[in-house]
């Protein structure tokens, strides 16, 4: 069953290199010509991904297995849209500030869609479009940012190991141990190493 879920990831999670345009952050920002990345290439940066059944998350055995194997004991939901989030425009701009966390950021899109932008090894931005059913894990120490897309709506399950800690450290915070560990594990790694994107 897990293989079927894994094989359909590209339908709910897509990644591409971004252009340098200053246009609205909610636009796709494709390069011309478009330059897509595989989810396995994303995994080389530590970004893991799954496709799950968002309509049945309460009883989904695959989600339960992932939570148990990775120790995700706490869960809540975050809805990002003008109607549900106070100070919506201010919040959306703050989410788009480049930052890192000292813990993994786990997000499972159960409705809507949004963009998670991550830096590659050469500091280029990769845009990761997560739609309903897509779950991603951003490793501790990776510089990233988030924005809704032009639909202005995402409902995401947030998962944590233990008590929820969501402290953003805006760039630069290269001195943090989580950043140094990220660089050692994913930036300085042997280019020949292969990492499974749904590990």
From Swiss-Prot:
GO molecular-function terms, A-Z: acireductone dioxygenase (Ni2+-requiring) activity; acireductone dioxygenase [iron(II)-requiring] activity; iron ion binding; nickel cation binding
Binding-site list for Fe(2+): 99, 101, 105, 144
Cofactor binding mode and count: Binds either 1 Fe or Ni cation per monomer. Iron-binding promotes an acireductone dioxygenase reaction producing 2-keto-4-methylthiobutyrate, while nickel-binding promotes an acireductone dioxygenase reaction producing 3-(methylsulfanyl)propanoate.
According to UniProt, this protein's pathway is:
Amino-acid biosynthesis; L-methionine biosynthesis via salvage pathway; L-methionine from S-methyl-5-thio-alpha-D-ribose 1-phosphate: step 5/6
The protein's required cofactor(s) are namely: Fe(2+); Ni(2+)
Q: What Enzyme Commission number(s) does the record list for this chain?
A: 1.13.11.54, 1.13.11.53
Q: Does the keyword Nucleus apply?
A: yes
Record has Amino-acid biosynthesis as a keyword: yes
- UniProt-recorded name of the protein: Acireductone dioxygenase 3
What is the native source organism of this protein?
Arabidopsis thaliana
Give the gene symbol: ARD3
């Amino acid at each position: 069953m897990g293989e079927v879920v894994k094989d359909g990831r590209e339908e709910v999670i897509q990644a591409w290199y971004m252009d340098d345009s200053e246009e609205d952050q909610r636009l796709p920002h494709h390069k011309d010509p478009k330059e897509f990345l595989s989810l396995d290439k994303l995994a080389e940066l530590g970004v893991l991904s799954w496709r799950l059944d968002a309509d049945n998350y309460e009883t989904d055995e695959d989600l339960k297995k992932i939570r148990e194997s990775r120790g995700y004991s706490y869960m809540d939901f975050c809805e990002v849209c003008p109607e549900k989030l106070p100070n919506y425009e201010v919040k959306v701009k703050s989410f788009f500030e480049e930052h890192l966390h000292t813990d993994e950021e786990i997000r499972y899109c159960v409705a809507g869609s949004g963009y998670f932008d991550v830096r590659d090894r050469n500091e280029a931005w990769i845009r990761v479009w997560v739609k309903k059913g897509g779950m991603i894990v951003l490793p501790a120490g990776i510089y990233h940012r988030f924005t809704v897309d032009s639909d202005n709506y995402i409902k995401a399950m947030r998962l944590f190991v233990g008590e929820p800690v969501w402290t953003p450290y805006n760039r630069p915070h290269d001195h943090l141990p989580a950043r140094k560990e990220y660089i050692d594990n994913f930036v300085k790694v042997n280019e020949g190493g292969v990492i499974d994107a749904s590990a």
